[in-house]
Amino acid sequence: MAYFEVKGIAKFFGGLAAVNDVSFQVEQGEIYGLIGPNRSGKTTIFNCINAYFPLTKGEIYFEGKKISGLKTHQICKRGVGRTFQVVKPLKRMTVLDNVIASAFLHTRIKSEAVDLAEKTIEFCELTQYKDKLAKSLPIASRKRLEITRALATKPKLLLLDETAAGLNPSELDEAIALIKKMRDSGITIIIVEHIMKVIMTISNRILAINHGMVIAEGSPTEVAGNHEVITAYLGEDYSAQS
């Protein structure tokens, strides 16, 4: 059985199918990309995985055990963490206290939570901001704090949602380096990203979706050259010319 598996999931809001019959598998140690136009269902898939949205149908498995039907905190305890597209740190708390708060999802012992937070901050290269208020951080550091908070829950599988949005070219390179560093530390990653430089550089495989349905899966090169993917992003006219 795959390390992580989504089997025929669907999420309906009334009569609208935000996600419909989506299936994929992720192997341990992989960076697996999710791409698609705006409102194609990518973040909804993340919300279904983490039980922010209950599934309309389908099942989700992690390490051979069914996690669909569990509550969000239970899924986190199993080792599935995530970041959010819109970062919302605890603005009136320091970076360290933000990360400690997340570490308490992994341990209830304060000394262990503090130690875990400090090590995670060092891993993510935020030590210089440790004692600063979260609201004072520049956007790139806020994005990195979001990742740091997620890592403090000690995930084995991490869902990254638009981590690179709003970053300049040098910050993008730093974000890519951090994602690879997380992968090299043993964390399996599923990433939603619009910036093709990021997704094509780091992903082992990519799943493309449109209107909540799978349109392609394969290597970055295979997906980038797929007719349906080109049409979804650039339109029929461009696809016909290519």
Task: Kindly label every feature range from the protein language model.
Residues 2-5, 9-242:
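Glycine-rich phosphate-binding loops of nucleotide-dependent enzymes
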